[in-house]
UniProtKB/Swiss-Prot annotation:
One of its GO terms (molecular function) is ATP binding. Belongs to the ATPase C chain family. InterPro entries: ATP_synth_F0_csu, ATP_synth_F0_csu_DDCD_BS, ATP_synth_F0_csu_sf, ATPase_proteolipid_c-like_dom, F/V-ATP_Csub_sf. Keywords: ATP-binding, CF(0), Hydrogen ion transport, Ion transport, Lipid-binding, Membrane, Mitochondrion, Nucleotide-binding, Transmembrane, Transmembrane helix, Transport. This is ATP synthase subunit 9, mitochondrial. It comes from Helianthus annuus (Common sunflower).
Length: 83
């Protein structure tokens, strides 16, 4: 039973990958819109976009790490049954 709970926890931790994909899409969309509105700030906007990508990918890299920790490193303590 506890093994199943660990699998559910690891699966829930990887949902953050979907959130990271949405975040990267938002960063790219905002970058394109800002360059379209003000082309003279394209270099500055590109720098901010790269920073946004890096921060979003940092969150995305934590998700598989947490899933690995939940599924294989955290030990299961079996409860002793009375009787």
């Amino acid at each position: 039973m506890l093994e199943g709970a660990k699998s559910i926890g690891a699966g829930a931790a990887t949902i953050a990958s979907a959130g990271a994909a949405i975040g990267i899409g938002n960063v790219l969309s905002s970058s394109i819109h800002s360059v379209a509105r003000n082309p003279s700030l394209a270099k500055q906007s590109f720098g901010y976009a790269i920073l946004g990508f890096a921060l979003t990918e940092a969150i995305a890299s934590f998700a598989p790490m947490m899933a690995f920790l939940i599924s294989s490193v955290i030990p299961i303590k079996e409860s002793k049954k009375e009787g």
